[in-house]
Amino acid sequence: MSQTLLVEDLHKRFGSGRRLVWANDGITMSVNAGEVVGLLGHNGAGKTTLVNQIVGLYRPYSGRIAVDGVDVVADPAAARRLVSVQAQENVPITGISPRKAVELVGRIRGGRRSAMRQRAKGLIDALDMGEWADRPAEKVSGGVARLSAFAMAVARPGALVVLDEPTNDVDPVRRQLLWDEVRRVADDGAAVLLVTHNVREAERAVDSLVLLDHGKILTKGTTASVVSEFGGGFRLDVDVARGAVPAFPDGWGVHRHDAAHWSVSVPEGGGVEAAEWATHARAAGQIVRYELGPVSLEEVYVALTTEADGTRAA
């Protein structure tokens, strides 16, 4: 796969003196054609600042950004030709329908009228938004407006597609349809950068990810590699019987949410032992319910950001 986006040692700062803040601090990452990469981080992690530099709205303090081989720091206008963006906030559309808006954006980006008419129809059908496609855009719901913004971004995608929180306000059924369409866009050859703070959702949608915290990359790689490196093992959730105090094997980490609900971290390779322990504990009346599964990306992310915050505080 060819490398569509390359970010090298990127720094961006705001303010000065005691108010100096490094919004991006040494960011290096890439996105290949045909790949969906998740840029994950909480509010204030530096995601939007990074995106604004990629699309040419901000100039870095130092570092390099190339899109499809073009230095977009030296030529920010090229970024607007090469990158298709769904911004975090919907751009207000008035006077036309979602269908016409999608067709118009496709034509602005160089598509032929007939081809963009077919493309708009295909996207509207794929996202199941035909009921609202020909209504005035200013009168549709927030979820439909969000779907419309996504369809506009991918009507005639550039080499790089940046999607900033694309599923905000979208209902669960159409959210899955949107993710299916994201995959099709990548399969057709575009590089996709998905910006989100919803770790659980991103875990199902991306090929690889970059975890950002306070302007720095905590880790990057495939979901499986990140979980394996920093997590691994299993999580056992149990509902404890009234008055019971179950005894857990050595090496298991126990967190009591309250008297009845406990979470237990089980070391890697301990899945069978955990299942056997839970079965016996339930038969003995110590617990009334249990759920066992692998450690999730969300849990790894929370642990990494908590550890990083603790290190800074120290």
Model-derived regions, located:
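Walker A (P-loop) phosphate-binding loop of ABC-type ATPase nucleotide-binding domains
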Residues: 42-46
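Helix-to-loop junction immediately C-terminal to a conserved catalytic motif
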Residues: 55
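Conserved ABC transporter NBD signature motif
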Residues: 63-74, 78-79
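Conserved ABC ATPase "signature" region
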Residues: 103, 107, 115-132
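ABC ATPase C-loop
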Residues: 153-154
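Catalytic Walker B motif of ABC-type/P-loop ATPase nucleotide-binding domains
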Residues: 161-165
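ABC transporter nucleotide-binding domain
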Residues: 179-267
